[in-house]
Amino acid sequence: MNDFRDSLSSEERSHLVSMQGKVKQTFLRHLQRPEWSAISLVAEWNSTMDSINVGMQTEGVKLACRAGCSHCCHASVEIFSPEAFAIVRTLKTLPADRLSAIRQRLLEYGLDNIDDPAWTKRPACPFLDDHRCSIYAVRPVACRQAHSLDVKACENDAPHIPQ
């Protein structure tokens, strides 16, 4: 697997390590709060991850990822329970026709892939709508951290997305 960090300069790598340290500090600080909750932790984690992404781009890292590019949305993604709760909360705000379409895609997704434990079919995420994430604001951490420097490397049907 091609790791995007291999293509970073030493200065960019140093910045990334610094940002990872900030994520860890944020996480630990959050756990010490009396009002701690898993859902608020996920929201803060997402915000921190987004800040890291912006910081990387500010530092000159050129990500190939763009709206409408959904190559990484054809991979198995595990989510944490609080992420699922945030997704459900978002889905409840959608118009009935969009929610019905997502429900149908979720059903088909489960039925089509029940016999594919090795995940060789690489089905589209049921939350994709015209190659765009319909839950982008609450997408799971696994999706937030998927980045590529080369869209061509993502276009194959490999079981892993190059990062």
Model-based region annotation:
Residues 1-163:
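Hydrophobic scaffolds flanking metal-cofactor catalytic centers in soluble metalloenzymes
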